[in-house]
Structures are given as C-alpha cells and as structure tokens.
Amino acid sequence: HAKESEMGNDTQKIAPPKLGEPYLLTPGPLTTSYAVKQAMLRDWGSWDDEFRAMTRKMRAQLLALLGPGHEDYDCVPIQGSGSYCVEAMLGSFVPRDGKLLVLANGAYGLRAAKTMEYLGRAYRLLDKGDYLPPRGDEVAAILAEDADITHVLIIHCETSSGILNPVEEIADAVNAAGRKVLIDSMSAFGAVPLEVQRTNYVAMVSSANIAALTRI
C-alpha cells in the first residue's frame, strides 16, 4: 500500500497537458511542457545580441561534454534532420580522393553508405546485419587489407535497434592504423559518455531531433 501511495504522489507531480491534449508516448519531440511552448512564442532575430550570446553559451556547453581536449574542437550548429547532419559531416570530412569504411549494423549505417553513393565518394561497407556490432579486430583486418581507406564511420548507437556499439574498441583499431574516425552519435551523445581524448575522432554529429523540438 505504501508503494501504491508513493506512486500516486509521483503521478500527481506530473503536470497534465495545459491545453487538455492527451499525453503522447510515441518516440520523438511530441509532448512538451507548457513552459517550452511559451518560450517558442517569442521571435528571435538571428543577429540579436541576446540570441548570439545564447548560441555561444550552447556551443560551449556542448563542447564541454566532450571532456578533456575539447578545446581543440568547435561546435557548429546546423539545421536539418539527423541524416542531413551525417551527410554534412561525410561531405565535409571525406575528401573526393578519400575512401570511407562504413560500419553498419542497422538502417542508419546503411543509410550512410547510400549517402556516400549520392556524394559520389568511394566507400566500403561492413554490414553486420541487425543484431551484431562491428568489432575492432575485424575493422583492423579490413584496414590492413585496404590501404585506400582514409576514414571510418562508427555508429555510436544504432537507433533502429538500440545496439550500443563498442566505439572505443573500434576507434583504437582505426587510430592504430593511422586512419581517421568519424562518429554518428545521433541517439547517444549527451546520454552516453563520448570523450574525445579517449576516441580521438575528427568529427562527431548528434541531434536533439529525437528528443526535442526541431532546431532546439
């Protein structure tokens, strides 16, 4: 009975939707607090001093999540979906004469490979299916065999399955081979540690689109 009472008290602390709409329990930025909705009523000028200061603070706070060594990096906010961000990273960091090793174990790794086709850049795909993570030893073997590979894309958490891939293990293999690490941490950054000093990646992308309103 005590537990039921505690649960009842906790439930009462959750404010009901202000406008009477139902709770939405599906994934994505759907149910938001009234305070967030109120904040969105204000129009911001992109060059207003207050908006620029807020953006500067946000960038600094995101960089701090990278841990020691974050001073050598910059945070570049861009608009668009998560796939848009991944495409921007691949198109910017993999040169036209480079080659990317895409590590896939789900829909988003495969989508990155398709993006490389659209970009007209060389790539090699290691497809582990939907249930197995790529491992450092098999990545090391591919890099030893294929000298043309310049970059390796690691999916931190494969969103379609929820599999958390062994980023540090793979990054160790890539760095040992003298190649460069790119990370898609779309559904993990901010929830799972990803220290740059430990993985030595050259670029990482993430997004709040899965948990917050667009462009927040």
Where do the model's predicted regions map?
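Short, Lys/Arg-enriched N-terminal segments with co-localized hydrophobic residues
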Residues: 1-6
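Conserved PLP-enzyme active-site core in the AAT-like
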Residues: 10-22, 26, 30, 61, ...
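A glycine-/small-polar-enriched, mobile loop at the entrance of the PLP active site in fold-type I
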Residues: 21-78, 83
